[in-house]
C-alpha cells in the first residue's frame, strides 16, 4: 500500500497541463498517459470494470462488500470524480516536488538561484500551517495539487477499503476526467453508464 503522499508525489511528475487551443479531448497527450497509469493502478487495487476511453476518461467500480442483499440494495452507489489536467497558466512540465517537514513558520526557499521564496508575508495563511509538512515545487512550475491531490486521495481511499474488508461499504464508482481546466470536466462522461447515485 502506498501512502497518499507517495501517490501524489508520483502523479505530479506527469505533465498533464491542458490547453484551450486544442480542438480534441484530451487537449494534451500527457493526460492520456496519466489516464493509463491510473487505470493500471485501479486494476492492481482490484477495482472492476476499469475503462479508459479514447478521450482519456477513466472509470471503474469497487463493488459493495455488504453481505446482506436487502441491506446492499438500500445503500446508494457513491461516485468520486477528479480531473487529470492542470492549469493552463503555468507549466506542469518537469515538476520537482519537495516535502518541507514540520514547517516552522518562516520563509521557505523554493529556488535559491532564482530567488523564489514562499513567505508568510506574501501568503499569510502559511501561519496556519506551522508544524505541518508542506509539499512545494522549485518555483518554476505549478505543483498540480488541483487535482492530483484529489486523485491521490481517491486512490488512497480505494486502497484502504480493499485492504480492510471489515469496513462495510456500498458500491464505489470512480472517474478521472480530462480537461477540467478548459471547461470539459464531465462533457464526455457517460453519466448513466457511470452509475453513481451521488457523486
What are these regions (language model features)?
Residues 2-133:
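Acidic/His- and Gly-rich active-site-bordering loop/insert found
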Residues 127-199:
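Acidic/histidine-rich catalytic neighborhood of metal-dependent amide-processing enzymes
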